[in-house]
Amino acid sequence: MDKEETIVTIVGSVLAHEGAEFVYAGKAAECESCKVAKVCHNAKLREGKRYRVVSVRKTKHDCAVHEGGAKAVEVAETIITAVIPTSQATRRTRITYTPVCDDVFCKGYAFCHPDGLTEKGRYVVLEVLGPYSECPKGTKNLKLVEMRPVPT
């Protein structure tokens, strides 16, 4: 198995534990005058992507955004579970993601638009979990898969 590429960043103390996940939202206005903003907003972090904390460092920082301060952590892009057409659902295949459905009121919307997945983003299908037959709209030929963004 490939070793995960990790990124050093700073997150709120509440999120600073192994396994915690978050979607990077970019800089807040309060970050402009912060002395550790360059680490917090590491150039390798991509807005809208989901990350998982893989290790926590001891250093704690005061933070104008996070109550209780912030800690340095190492993060990696996380695996995302989503629904895609069966025609794209082949293990180890690179795909360009297009959501199956755009109905925000649909019960299955979270599977078609999981946090951290971007439309027209490039992903590798890691695992095909099986058929997805629970589409409230009745769409056929769907699979539930685990994907990871293609490294850039």
From Swiss-Prot:
Family matches, as InterPro entries? UPF0179
Q: Would you say which domain of life the source belongs to?
A: Archaea
Q: Could you list the residue ranges that cross the membrane?
A: none
> What's the family?
Belongs to the UPF0179 family.
Q: What is this protein called?
A: UPF0179 protein Mlab_1307
Annotated source species:
Methanocorpusculum labreanum (strain ATCC 43576 / DSM 4855 / Z)
